[in-house]
């Protein structure tokens, strides 16, 4: 018999302790992983609702189970808000993740063995854009494009490779690139060879929704995103298009269900609906502009302190600190900063001589600190502390001093005030 007063603390104290410890970690650590963010209590309320009990295979109005009249309302709200947010005429909000959204696009548009042009993972791409260890690299013939010596996407190389290999699909988007992508140029190249243009905007979806980064939806045949990261919603995925192609939309829907998934997670879709509504508010635009402002402020300090930033700066929410030539690996930098309650991730940089498990760089992003209320002043102060540690990563006194400063700053800017 279920009762409303059932709780984890009494029933499963071991699990409850882990949850409490993670909650404390989030409050007492500065989160700089570019793909992480804090979602709102409203989103978490939706995810913790009784919608989690409902199976709803199919799509609104076309379900395989009864009793779906209310979850149809929930999913329709999410769909319509996603379309409004990004200027799309089609949205599928069922993908459980960004990677599953991407796999659905591959399934809808390609056959195994087809040629795909995607950004090199070592140059800032994503696993699902053709990495040999991922389904994309195993099932398809991947031709990687990259960045030039300035750290910017090399569109001349992209066009040359496209003309030479004639891929059926080109992929735009990234996981560690700090520049602006020219979506119109990519579409021009795709049209030249008769290829689909697929954009994975997961990292910059929030910036795009707020109008502070170019929107790929008018240019691409299909666009995917996660719903967390800069969008600050629940962990999940979404597929969008403005191609006005009903045949394409049917292929995409079929590739999600029944092609790759069964029942959608209705409680997560409710969380997506809330997040999309939040992203339509004026304050969301203010937040996203501050995300970019904070990233630029951090880059300024890194450069002043003599650190190299891949591409020399940032136009979005992230930066890649290049440690090649320094007596410090990305793994060591990650660990040293972590000891001071600053969370980053080690990351490969272009022409990295070290393995992906060690790396010669760290990736840093500003969505989470901006969500806490950091502005340029705090971002610059924090970057100075990071440089202090990177300058002397084996010095416990420096790490302990910075940790104290971090704890004081976190106390001033609680995640959930």
Swiss-Prot record:
Associated pathway: One-carbon metabolism; tetrahydrofolate interconversion; Amino-acid biosynthesis; glycine biosynthesis; glycine from L-serine: step 1/1
Recorded GO MF terms: glycine hydroxymethyltransferase activity; pyridoxal phosphate binding
Compartment list: Cytoplasm
CC cofactor: pyridoxal 5'-phosphate
Top class in the EC scheme: transferase
InterPro entries according to UniProt: PyrdxlP-dep_Trfase, PyrdxlP-dep_Trfase_major, PyrdxlP-dep_Trfase_small, Ser_HO-MeTrfase, Ser_HO-MeTrfase-like, Ser_HO-MeTrfase_PLP_BS, SHMT-like_dom
GO biological process entries: glycine biosynthetic process from serine; tetrahydrofolate interconversion
Main location: cytoplasm
Alphabetical list of Gene3D superfamilies matching this protein: Aspartate Aminotransferase, domain 1, Type I PLP-dependent aspartate aminotransferase-like (Major domain)
Chemical reaction(s) catalysed: (6R)-5,10-methylene-5,6,7,8-tetrahydrofolate + glycine + H2O = (6S)-5,6,7,8-tetrahydrofolate + L-serine
Protein EC: 2.1.2.1
Binding site for (6S)-5,6,7,8-tetrahydrofolate: 121, 125-127, 355-357
Keywords, ordered alphabetically: Amino-acid biosynthesis, Cytoplasm, One-carbon metabolism, Pyridoxal phosphate, Transferase
Site (Plays an important role in substrate specificity): 228
GO cellular component terms, A-Z: cytosol
Residues bearing the modification N6-(pyridoxal phosphate)lysine: 229
SUPFAM superfamilies reported for this sequence: PLP-dependent transferases
Domain of life of the native organism: Bacteria
Quaternary data: Homodimer.
Stated family: Belongs to the SHMT family.
Matches recorded under PANTHER family: SERINE HYDROXYMETHYLTRANSFERASE
Function: Catalyzes the reversible interconversion of serine and glycine with tetrahydrofolate (THF) serving as the one-carbon carrier. This reaction serves as the major source of one-carbon groups required for the biosynthesis of purines, thymidylate, methionine, and other important biomolecules. Also exhibits THF-independent aldolase activity toward beta-hydroxyamino acids, producing glycine and aldehydes, via a retro-aldol mechanism.
Record-given protein name: Serine hydroxymethyltransferase
Gene: glyA
């Amino acid at each position: 018999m279920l009762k409303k007063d059932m709780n984890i603390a009494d029933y499963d104290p071991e699990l409850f302790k882990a949850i409490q410890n993670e909650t404390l970690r989030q409050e007492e650590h500065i989160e700089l992983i570019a793909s992480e963010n804090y979602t709102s209590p409203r989103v978490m309320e939706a995810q913790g609702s009784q919608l989690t009990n409902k199976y709803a295979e199919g799509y609104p109005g076309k379900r395989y189970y009864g009793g779906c009249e209310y979850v149809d309302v929930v999913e329709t709200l999410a769909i319509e808000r996603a379309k409004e947010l990004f200027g799309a005429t089609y949205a599928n909000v069922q993908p459980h993740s960004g990677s599953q959204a991407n796999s659905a696009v591959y399934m809808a548009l390609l056959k195994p063995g087809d040629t795909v042009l995607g950004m090199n993972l070592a140059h800032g791409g994503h696993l699902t854009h053709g990495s040999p260890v991922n389904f994309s690299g195993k099932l398809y013939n991947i031709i990687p494009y990259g960045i030039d010596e300035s750290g910017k996407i090399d569109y001349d190389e992209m066009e040359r490779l496209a003309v030479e290999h004639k891929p059926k699909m080109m992929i735009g988007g990234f996981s560690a690139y700090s520049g602006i992508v020219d979506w119109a140029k990519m579409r021009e190249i795709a049209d030249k060879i008769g290829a689909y243009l697929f954009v994975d905007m997961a990292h910059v979806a929030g910036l795009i929704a707020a109008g502070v980064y170019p929107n790929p939806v008018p240019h691409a045949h299909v666009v995917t995103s996660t719903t967390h990261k800069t969008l600050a919603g629940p962990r999940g995925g979404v597929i969008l298009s403005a191609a006005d192609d009903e045949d394409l939309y049917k292929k995409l829907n079929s590739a999600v269900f029944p092609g790759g998934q069964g029942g959608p997670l209705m409680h997560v879709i409710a969380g997506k609906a809330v997040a999309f509504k939040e992203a339509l508010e004026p304050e969301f635009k203010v937040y996203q502009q501050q995300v970019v402002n904070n990233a630029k402020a951090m880059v300024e300090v890194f450069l002043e302190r003599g650190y190299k930033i891949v591409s020399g700066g940032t136009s979005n929410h992230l930066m890649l600190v290049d440690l090649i030539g320094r007596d410090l690996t990305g793994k060591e930098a990650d660990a040293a900063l972590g000891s001071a309650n600053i969370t980053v991730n080690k990351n490969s940089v272009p022409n990295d001589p070290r393995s992906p498990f060690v790396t010669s760089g760290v990736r840093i992003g500003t969505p989470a600190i901006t969500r806490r209320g950091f502005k340029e002043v705090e971002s610059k102060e924090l970057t100075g502390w990071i440089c202090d540690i990177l300058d002397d990563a084996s010095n416990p006194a420096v790490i302990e001093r910075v940790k104290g400063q971090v704890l004081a700053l976190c106390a001033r800017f609680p995640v959930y005030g």
